[in-house]
A protein has these predicted regions:
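N-terminal subdomain of nucleotide-sugar transferases
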Residues: 1-59, 193
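Acidic anion/phosphate-binding donor-loop and adjacent secondary structure
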Residues: 32, 146-148, 178, 195-200
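A conserved catalytic-core segment of Leloir-type glycosyltransferases
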Residues: 36-109
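Short His-centered aromatic/hydrophobic patch
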Residues: 96, 117-122
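Active-site proximal beta-strand in glycosyltransferases
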Residues: 114-117, 125-146, 167, 186-189
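Short, well-ordered alpha-helical microsegments
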Residues: 122-126, 174
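Membrane-proximal helix-turn-helix segments that form the acceptor-binding/catalytic region
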Residues: 149-166
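Carbohydrate-associated surface elements
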Residues: 172, 194
Length: 200
């Protein structure tokens, strides 16, 4: 199967980044074709057998080949302290435009049969608009983001409405999701995070 993964953060330094990277690695090991769309402010480590599509951001000073600000987060990240609430209207428009372009280009070239987006948030909303079955994993910080920045609630609502399924990584996340978006109850799957048996 051709599966496109979309995340709001790089593939290291955050829970959802690590989650996305591990999913990509293991799907590729099982013979699936995988593409990942994500933000980056430095050269990413390649994953064998995985197509990497990233939107470039500026970490310290604006770069010509990148958006002139750092990638936004819900809290902080080892490589960014910018939050979604820090973005002004122009920066948010640049963010959405850059990711919409990257997602549409990946869809056109990679031709995914399924999209798995992380967080009930902006990029899940962008991903779910193209008529391709979309699954979203809620990690909890997205739901906290709706509380913290109500101006982003609309993106989350549309993402939740347009996706086929939502994966909750814990019972608490599932309850918070259903409280905020009651229409998702029938489409939610509880799937606890796994672990690497080779390590633990």
């Amino acid at each position: 199967m051709r599966i496109m993964l979309v995340n709001h953060f790089p593939l290291d330094g955050s829970g959802s980044g690590t989650y996305t990277k591990n999913i990509a690695v293991h799907l590729a090991m099982r013979g699936h074709q995988v593409c990942v769309v994500f933000p980056e402010n430095e050269a990413p480590q390649e994953i064998p057998g995985v197509s990497m599509r990233y939107v470039r951001f500026s970490r310290y000073v604006p770069r010509k080949d990148a958006l002139p600000f750092n990638f936004p987060c819900f809290t902080t990240h080892p490589r960014s302290v910018t939050t979604f609430g820090d973005l002004d209207g122009g920066e948010l428009a640049q963010y959405l435009t850059a990711f919409d372009t990257a997602i549409m280009q990946a869809i056109d070239e990679f031709k995914p049969e399924l999209i798995h987006a992380q967080h009930v948030w902006c990029l899940a909303w962008l991903s779910a608009q193209h008529g391709i079955p979309t699954v979203i994993t809620t990690h909890g910080t997205d739901l906290m983001g709706c509380e913290k920045w109500p101006e982003f609630q609309g993106f989350a609502e549309l993402a939740a409405k347009r996706c086929e399924k939502i994966i909750a990584v814990s019972g608490d996340n599932m309850r918070a999701l259903h409280c905020r978006f009651p229409e998702t109850v029938e489409r939610t799957v509880l799937l606890h995070n796994g672990y690497n048996e080779d390590v633990f």
